[in-house]
UniProtKB/Swiss-Prot annotation:
InterPro entries: Cystatin_sf, Kininogen_Fetuin_HRG
Protein name per the record: Histidine-rich glycoprotein
Biased composition (Basic residues): 266-284, 304-322
Function: Plasma glycoprotein that binds a number of ligands such as heme, heparin, heparan sulfate, thrombospondin, plasminogen, and divalent metal ions. Inhibits rosette formation. Acts as an adapter protein and implicated in regulating many processes such as immune complex and pathogen clearance, cell adhesion, angiogenesis, coagulation and fibrinolysis. Mediates clearance of necrotic cells through enhancing the phagocytosis of necrotic cells in a heparan sulfate-dependent pathway. This process can be regulated by the presence of certain HRG ligands such as heparin and zinc ions.
Basic and acidic residues biased stretches: 197-208, 255-265, 285-296
GO molecular function, one term: signaling receptor binding
Length: 396
């Protein structure tokens, strides 16, 4: 039976589980801030944990204990897995919080600066192939004293972490000095900088620094395709590759011929279709990706039904099964002041294939809906300033 257990007591298990999730991630990696809820299903010496975790990302392929943290994006995960250090399934939600922390106007003797945080996306309705991207950006805008024209800042510095299915956390830095007497001419009279993520059409003084993350160890990425998408922020030239195909928590590659570029939104809803204090609805998911990060683009047309695979078992002929990916991470738009990050749904499949390596392992049960009395656990004291973005209690 699935019973509540102590959050602080299972923290080492949660840390190991996040390490497994991070092995399949490119770009943002998760660090444990707190175990928010925990349940345990124990049969003899076999245990399956059901965890709700609050996480903080870092931008490095190193182990997160060795990284310097820059808290701009937070996340929460629900996961289920046995104590033999494998993760059966998980769902996560992430969102940028720096807008709620750092959006401000600073005035000095020589000028006025604005510090903004915003998310960018490519949801073009044009007829060329759509390659969905999503990213979080931080922009610093500087104006002369008492400047009334907000469309022509004297200087703009923008840093973005942009996510694309063919690239891993490509970091973009845009510096745009505006010299005396110089003006930016925006298309259709629109301002040159839009926090909503409008397209940038280039400027002679722009400088771009493109960086691919370090390669994953012991993995062959020689077949990675070049980048070919059009995006709202500048991307690496076509010859630059960031060859990091993601890996699953069980060590398996993504299918090698994944041509899907559609993003999926469960039930056809926008990620913020529900109040931020409620659950985030997650229904069916695309069948042809392992770790698939969902950005806030409009839902695509209905996808064809999932493919079926046929396997031959020893002496049992053919049987059919659905290939299902392990784990989903859903990116939500930036949080505003007073909002909390919605929890993901734990819509894990009601069935589980038998574990031939450990036949005594109990089947994965429905994720517990009630909160454990000895939870949540202790919040990481270094990051108490972002604890307000997490709900302290689960819905009863």
């Amino acid at each position: 039976a699935v019973n509540p257990t102590g959050c602080d007591a299972v923290e080492p298990v949660a840390v190991r589980a996040l390490d497994l999730i991070n092995k399949g991630r490119d770009g943002y990696l998760f660090q444990l801030l707190r175990v928010a809820d925990a349940h345990l299903d124990k049969v003899e010496s076999i245990a399956v944990y059901y965890l709700v975790e609050s996480d903080c990302p870092v931008l490095s392929r190193k182990h997160w204990d060795d990284c310097e943290l820059n808290v701009t994006v937070i996340g929460q995960c629900k996961l289920a897995g046995p104590e033999d250090l494998s993760v059966n399934d998980f769902n996560c939600t992430t969102s940028s919080v720096s807008s709620a922390l750092t959006n401000m106007r600073a005035r000095g003797g020589e000028g006025t600066s604005y510090f903004l945080d915003f998310s960018v996306r490519n949801c073009s309705s044009h007829h060329f192939p759509r390659h969905h991207i999503f990213g979080f950006c931080r922009a610093d805008l500087f104006y002369d004293v008492e400047a009334s024209d907000l469309e022509t800042p004297k200087d703009i510095v923008t840093n973005c972490e942009v996510f694309h299915r063919r690239f891993s956390a490509v970091q973009h830095h845009l510096g745009r000095p505006f010299h005396s007497g110089e003006h930016e001419h925006s298309p259709a009279g629109r301002p040159p900088f839009k926090p909503s993520g409008s397209k940038d059409h280039g400027h002679p003084h722009e400088s771009y620094n493109f960086r691919c993350p370090p390669p994953l160890e012991h993995k062959n990425h020689s077949d990675s395709p070049p980048f070919q998408a059009r995006a709202p922020l500048p991307f690496p030239p076509p010859g630059l590759r960031c060859p990091h195909p993601p890996f699953g928590t069980k060590g398996n590659h993504r299918p090698p011929h994944d041509h899907s570029s559609d993003e999926h939104h469960p039930h056809g809803h926008h990620p913020h279709g529900h109040h931020p204090h409620g659950h985030h609805p997650h229904g069916h998911h695309p069948p042809d990706n392992d770790f698939y990060d969902h950005g806030p683009c409009d839902p695509p047309p209905h996808r064809p039904p999932p493919r079926h695979s046929k396997e031959r078992g020893p002496g049992k002929g053919h049987f059919r099964f659905h290939w299902r990916p392990t784990g989903y991470i859903h990116r939500l738009p930036s949080l505003k002041k007073g909002e909390v990050l919605p929890l993901p749904e734990a819509n894990f499949p009601s069935f589980s294939l038998p574990n031939h390596n450990n036949p005594l392992q109990p089947e994965i049960q429905a994720f517990p809906q009630s909160a454990s009395e000895s939870c949540p656990g202790t919040f990481n004291i270094k990051f108490l300033h972002i604890s307000k973005f997490f709900a302290y209690t689960l819905p009863k």
